[in-house]
């Protein structure tokens, strides 16, 4: 997706949020766009809003894992993926990411 399209998507989801701030998916979609724009702290802020509205939103929790990886908060990323596993045990990304993150933490501590 081009930078222009991402910026347009950001504007659109910001308007959606202003119209209905209680719709978790509006926050989640904007969090995704912010992640794609490399605005990871802002993405996490929107994920926090999603989880206030819907604490079992596995998409937001999975996205939080990705954001926390970018912010180098690997333990927090692992915790996010563990929460996803509780809600959606058959989702594959936590099964892949948790071992990789544990290995990364181990290699960085050497």
Protein language model regions, located:
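Canonical positions in the second alpha-helix
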Residues: 15-16, 49-50, 83-84
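Register position in tetratricopeptide repeats
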Residues: 2, 36-37, 70, 100-107
């Amino acid at each position: 997706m081009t930078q222009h399209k991402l910026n347009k998507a950001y504007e659109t989801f910001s308007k959606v949020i202003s119209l209905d701030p209680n719709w978790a998916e509006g926050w989640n979609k904007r969090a995704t766009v912010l992640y794609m724009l490399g605005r990871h702290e802002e993405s996490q802020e929107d994920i926090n809003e999603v989880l206030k509205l819907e604490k079992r939103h596995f998409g937001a929790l999975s996205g939080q894992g990705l954001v926390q990886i970018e912010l180098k908060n690997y333990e927090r990323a692992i915790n996010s993926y563990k929460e996803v596993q509780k809600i959606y045990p058959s989702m594959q990304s936590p099964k892949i990411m948790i071992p990789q993150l544990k290995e990364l933490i181990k290699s960085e501590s050497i």
